[in-house]
């Protein structure tokens, strides 16, 4: 594969990550779901009756303050008016595996790092296949615009060796 194509694919990945919209209910940093390797999915978990907490084994922190610092750090996390949060890829997969991919599962596709999820197979030893299948359906435009998983892996490795 020529170097120009490798650079184009790398540039696409960078632009897709930097071009993420903020996840409105998240109060960490700039509110974008790209601040660490796992919190890449902007999902509505602050809505009443969500099954997210049940299927991920977590306790709801929505409506509480995390005191993260910065301009948003002391605001309530995933409040009812903005019930989204940058959730872990593993939590996304477990939630979908338990709930299915119906109307109960809602994502902000413009604020989700879909390409990162597409290129990931496991997160904290959790198989991400349920998340792949659901995001491919619910965030189809973003999913289809990502490089093929195999191509991304080969090109990133090749780019790093240069």
Q: Can you annotate each of these PLM segments?
A:
Residues 63-77:
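Short alpha-helix capping/helix-loop boundary micro-motifs
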Residues 16-52:
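Extended boundary segments
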């Amino acid at each position: 594969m020529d170097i120009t194509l490798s650079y184009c694919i790398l540039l696409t990945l960078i632009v897709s990550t930097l071009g993420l919209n903020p996840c409105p209910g998240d109060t960490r940093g700039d509110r974008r779901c790209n601040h660490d390797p796992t919190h890449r999915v902007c999902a509505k978990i602050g809505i009443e009756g969500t099954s997210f907490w049940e299927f991920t084994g977590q306790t709801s922190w929505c409506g509480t303050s995390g005191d993260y610092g910065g301009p948003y750090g002391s605001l309530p996390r995933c409040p009812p008016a903005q019930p989204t949060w940058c959730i872990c890829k593993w939590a996304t997969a477990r939630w979908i595996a338990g709930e299915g991919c119906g109307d109960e599962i809602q994502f902000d596709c413009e604020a989700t790092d879909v390409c990162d999820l597409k290129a990931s197979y496991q997160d904290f030893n959790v198989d991400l296949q349920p998340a792949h299948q659901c995001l491919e359906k619910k965030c189809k435009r973003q999913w289809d615009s990502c490089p093929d998983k195999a191509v991304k892996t080969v090109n990133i490795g090749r780019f790093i060796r240069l």
